[in-house]
Regions:
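Catalytic core of pol beta-like nucleotidyltransferases
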Residues: 1-53, 62-70, 77-166
Length: 166
């Protein structure tokens, strides 16, 4: 199987991404007995002119990660969101795919606790992204796009970690 490579384009569809975010937000907020406190559209699809892979990133704030029960996971599965099992610390990640054969992500939910450090890191990261979008675009352009999506995501994470540690 050939590894997926990130396909990046300049975001000139911010309004379309915002509409899709609003649709997903409505679904999330109306889930029965939802533990969700608030949501926020984050990442490059929320910023005009950002170089983006087109994945809509949504920050989902809950009282506690323990509030995300098996029942909530099943409800998210019914909306075609599937939990990504990675060694994430203090967050859960769910993805929605364009299809389940290629596993091309179209939406990613980043679920964090209301009073946790992760929430502040995401909010600070979004502010940095908005302020330094040209530098981030240059960084993305400079990456070797023969790398896999996983390697690409790791490089993006490294950029944010460097910026957050300053």
């Amino acid at each position: 199987m050939q590894k997926q490579k990130p396909l990046l384009t300049i975001n000139n569809k911010t309004e379309q991404y915002r509409i899709k975010f609003e649709e997903i937000n409505k679904i999330l907020i109306t889930l029965l007995d939802t533990p969700i406190i608030k949501t926020m559209h984050i990442g490059s699809t929320s910023i005009d002119g950002a170089l983006t892979s087109g994945i809509i990133d949504i920050l989902v704030v809950v009282k506690s990660l323990h509030a995300m029960t098996t029942l909530d996971e099943k409800r998210l599965n019914l909306q075609n969101f599937y939990r990504l099992h990675h060694p994430y610390q203090k967050k859960c990640v769910y993805a929605q795919f364009s299809n389940l054969q290629s596993l091309t992500e179209v939406v990613r939910l980043h679920i964090v606790e209301e009073d946790g450090k992760k929430l502040n890191q995401y909010l600070t990261g979004q502010s940095i992204l908005i302020e330094q979008i040209q530098a981030f675009n240059q960084y993305k352009k400079a990456l070797n796009h023969e790398i896999s999506v996983k390697e690409y995501e790791n490089k993006k994470s490294e950029w944010f970690k460097r910026k957050l540690s300053v």
